[in-house]
Amino acid sequence: MHFAMKEKHENLWIAQRQGRAKDSNDRTQDSVLKMMAMAGEGDVTERLKELNIVPLAISYEYDPCDFLKAKELQQKRDDEHFQKSPEDDLINMQTGLYGYKGRIHFQTSACLNHELDELKELNLPKCDLFTAISETIDRHIHSSYRLFAGNYVACDLLMGDNRFTAEYTEEEKEHFEKYLEQQ
């Protein structure tokens, strides 16, 4: 990774997890950062600064795997021994790649090097430092997510109120409700 970036001047993209969290609440894993900090010069923050980490949030209007996630959660609820099959994983990957996502928004944050310097100044134990860096990345990603009309409609439907009606039209609400019915 360090060689590809420093010597070959290439950019790399690393997913936060081994896949999406069922509730879409993805969190950066400390172990990924530990792997990234294994090579390079200097202390942990210096090695990570060499990588010029830029958090990226990818927001989809629709999650193509929503019905698959719901099905799996229900199966796990109904059968504590339920395990997804390899075929289920392939279907999930295929659906995630090719399924309907609606509008897609990519949002990058600024490079984290300045914040890594600030975290270094705290003199945290190494384990706590990795956690603090993960939380910093997550904060940037979560604050960069784009919410679409369906997100607001879903929240209002779930909560049984009209708190976010200013964020969507009646037509968008009807469209989202129709989408839900088709799932």
List where the protein language model places each region.
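Membrane-interfacial terminal anchoring regions of lipid-handling membrane enzymes
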Residues: 2-12, 18-183
